[in-house]
């Protein structure tokens, strides 16, 4: 009896990993990306990035980003292509739903950011300030990263992977939004009040998650996320 129970547990765990290995691999890839694993690996071979001129250094970082994205796109090739077919088949409905979700997210994000800025007496979040500084230093690289790399990576982990791991719709939406919001706060954390910015970032994350649950099409939130980030980066580049 005990051995049978142990075998059942072992088989259940094995089957769970088989079903979810792509989502778990995505989380691992994101961890490696965030910790600059490939860059650190190259540094261990004696490459000093601080001595490399700006242009080739930025190019190396762009190649590093592309490697991760290519792996992800190959892993989820069927999902991406299926999403494109769905988008072609229901184009007008998908555009309308995407627009509604995006506008709702933007309204909540903008309103909550304004209220938080009044409370903290600062114009933008620390994360936003760091992004603006990076844009002023390397605008083309940041346009590439924010408009292509980040949307694909973030949607694959915070939407596609979490949706695959969490089977309950509204729990998934809340966890997706919360984790997405925390990502944009923890990296530039200076104090407890910074966690207030989880609300604006999390709200747009929840809207992207809701969009996925309504369509089961990961391509859609990726595209909306790309458009959203591209608009913001271009506004910063043009407006200075």
Which residues are covered by each model-predicted region?
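Gram-positive cell-envelope targeting signals
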Residues: 1-28, 32-40, 95, 141, ...
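Interfacial transmembrane-helix boundary/kink motif in multi-pass membrane proteins
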Residues: 3-29, 53-58, 80-111, 167-168, ...
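Alpha-helical hydrophobic membrane-insertion segments
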Residues: 13-17, 24-28, 59-73, 92-96, ...
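Alpha-helical transmembrane segments in multi-pass membrane proteins
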Residues: 21-79, 126-129, 141
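Juxtamembrane "helix-exit" motif on the non-cytosolic side of transmembrane helices
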Residues: 37-49, 115-120, 185-189
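Juxtamembrane helix-loop-helix connectors linking adjacent transmembrane helices
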Residues: 47-55, 80-150, 237
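Non-cytosolic membrane-interface motifs at loop->transmembrane helix junctions
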Residues: 52-58, 128-133, 192-203
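Transmembrane helix-loop-helix hairpins at the membrane interface
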Residues: 107-110, 114, 118, 136-240
């Amino acid at each position: 009896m005990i051995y049978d129970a142990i075998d059942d547990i072992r088989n259940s765990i094995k089957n769970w990993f088989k079903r979810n290995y792509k989502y778990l691999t995505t989380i691992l890839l994101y961890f490696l990306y965030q910790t600059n694993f490939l860059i650190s690996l190259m540094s261990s071979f004696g490459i000093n990035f601080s001595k490399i001129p700006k242009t080739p250094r930025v190019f190396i970082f762009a190649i590093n980003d592309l490697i991760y994205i290519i792996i992800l796109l190959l892993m989820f090739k069927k999902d991406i292509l299926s999403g494109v077919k769905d988008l072609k088949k229901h184009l007008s409905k998908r555009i309308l739903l995407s627009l509604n979700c995006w506008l709702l997210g933007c309204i909540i994000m903008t309103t909550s950011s304004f209220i938080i800025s009044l409370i903290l007496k600062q114009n933008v979040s620390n994360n936003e300030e760091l992004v603006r500084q990076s844009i002023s230093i390397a605008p083309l690289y940041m346009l590439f990263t924010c408009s292509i790399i980040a949307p694909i990576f973030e949607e694959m982990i915070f939407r596609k992977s979490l949706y695959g791991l969490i089977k309950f719709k509204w729990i998934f939406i809340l966890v997706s939004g919360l984790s997405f919001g925390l990502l944009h706060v923890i990296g530039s954390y200076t104090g407890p009040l910074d966690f207030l910015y989880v609300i604006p970032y999390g709200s747009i994350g929840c809207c992207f998650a809701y969009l996925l649950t309504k369509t089961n099409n990961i391509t859609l939130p990726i595209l909306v996320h790309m458009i959203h980030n591209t608009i913001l980066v271009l506004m910063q580049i043009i407006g200075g």
